[in-house]
Amino acid sequence: MEKSKDELLAGIKTLERVEPFPDEVFYKVFEIEDNVERQKYIEALRNAAREIKRISEFNNLFKQFQLDYIQRMKQSGNKTRFTDQPVELTCGEWNADDMGVRCTRYDKQFQPMQVLACSHPILPVEILKNVDTSEERITLAYYKSAAWQQITVNRSVCANTNKIVDVLSQYGIEVTSDNAKSMVRYISDCVGMNPVVLNPKRSINRLGWMGREFMPYVTDVVYDGGKDFDPVFQNIRHEGSFEAWRTHCADLRKNKIVRMAFAASFASVLIEPLNALPFVFHLWSGESGTAKTVTIMAAMSIWGNPKMGGLVKTMNTTKVGIVRNAAFLYSLPFAGDELQTLKDKWVTNFDQLIYQITEGIDKMRGRANGGVDETKTWRNSFLFTGEEPITKANSRGGSKNRVIEIEVEERLVADGNCTVSVLTENYGHAGEKLIHYLQEVDLQVIRDEYKGYFDAMCHLDTTEKQAMAMSCLLVADRILVEQIFKDEQPFGIEDVKEYLRSAAEVDVAERAYQMVLNWIARNPVRFEDPKAAESLNKGEVWGKILQNEDQPGQSPVAVINKDVLCDYLEQAGFDYAAVSKKWAKKNRLERNSQEKYIHNTKVYGIKANYIKLIMEPNRDPNGFVSVDDMEDEEQMSLPFD
């Protein structure tokens, strides 16, 4: 039979020195809810213990019982009891119901205190572990405005009292500097006590390949991308009829350039399996109405809804925007319309853009609070349209190397409006089929096919990077024909070699040399003696042209003031030190007596440092080429002949 307080108190006074204090004495203390009554009872017990001269023993035992009680309270199996809660969790000492989240704590005097973690229902419902970085994020469900809502944040947010206030308060969660510590503890307790329910799930914040899996065509990986990329992610799906899409696109693909665009789009997902490099596929035309945009939309309809603002982006953006979208797409193609809108941002050419996106890695960025952000990477193709070429005459060889550039001279799609209507109603089926094919096929077979194309094209007058990109397109076209457009025949090298750049087109030194020759031809007066009677040169002297009249077949030599030549090359986007070495290898520069290329000599009485550039053999001192010296195939027929 349970004893009353008075009976327990009386029992203490009759205890012998060898008898222990009954446990019931201490348990009775914890049963008293009223703070005043509890303290009165404790003081009465202490007085009784003092009378029998065992006060120290009582105080020590009472302190240990207090600690034991607090520990058992923390380990208690309370459950969350929110109405319509997404999941039920064990929450330990916390009382979690529709009135909020709170618990009872005790001060040094063992006085109970109500500690509030949150004034409304809240609990963790999911933990996501990124497959790329192994970093975790946590999803919190909270009840506000008469509805359950969810937010996913980094685990570090829920482990730091400052961060949890800054981040969660923005979403209406009632967390302040006063209850932040308790909120952190509550969330931590819920996670620690529910390892099965809150077992981390695999997640990813981008699209594309994850080993042999491909996002979004995988079921056991949770998408955890930012809201900024929702317009892209939500449009990567299938809609409408696959047959309607295939029939219409098969008709479009009768145009070789349109078919090349389809291959460039699908080749994007082959770049990583083939260990190739990102490349740019650019369609341009000085005339509007050639259906360049519709062509890119058709190519992107392989993966989803190709509407503008979704899978096809305007290029009226920033460098950071392009890089972030490329990193999000990762393996899927980046499609950008109207490239010329970037002209003001990249000044005279797009070399910087081309280099950055085809490197496949973003620059290292520091954090305001120390450390560095995760460095973004991507392995995809870039499909652009524009009103002008993406590379210029003064573009560096590396940028020309990485681009497959096609001028559109005729309309690509007969009825653009009809095509857009079909493509925005039927799309996305082919992408999933093609990815499943790549997941099942032996990739080594595809790699061998790619290497065969690559080796064959390397024997043509082109560069390795051009061959690499075009080989990807040929493999992609073969798979598209085999899996989707079965009535067609795959492209061969002969079908596409017209779009490959020659080695000379890519060679920066060769282009610089030709530009210097043209520059001399445009300015013959600057190479005349200003003191000559018939000279038209009334200004600067840039040099002179040396021609051996006794040996007319010998190449003329342009003696050019070094500073003038360097200034011209710099304005044209070339570096003298870089191109002069290649000129020397091709014996286009004369050496002095010390085997140097700089001649300290006089030109028309003016002593300075000069470069002696050997001009083409059949070019006269004024820069012209004799028609008689031209090969027959080089001559053009005249329209009035």
Each model region followed by its residue ranges:
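DNA transaction DNA-binding modules
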Residues: 32-39, 63-83, 193-252, 445-641
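P-loop NTPase catalytic core of nucleic-acid-dependent motor ATPases
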Residues: 220-308
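Conserved catalytic/switch belt of AAA+ P-loop NTPases
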Residues: 350-365
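Conserved glycine-centered beta->alpha loop in an early N-terminal alpha/beta scaffold
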Residues: 2-8, 34-256, 324-325, 329-332, ...
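Phosphate-sensing "switch" segment of ASCE/P-loop ATPases
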Residues: 376-381, 394-487
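AAA+/SF3 P-loop NTPase mechanochemical coupling elements
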Residues: 327, 367-384, 399
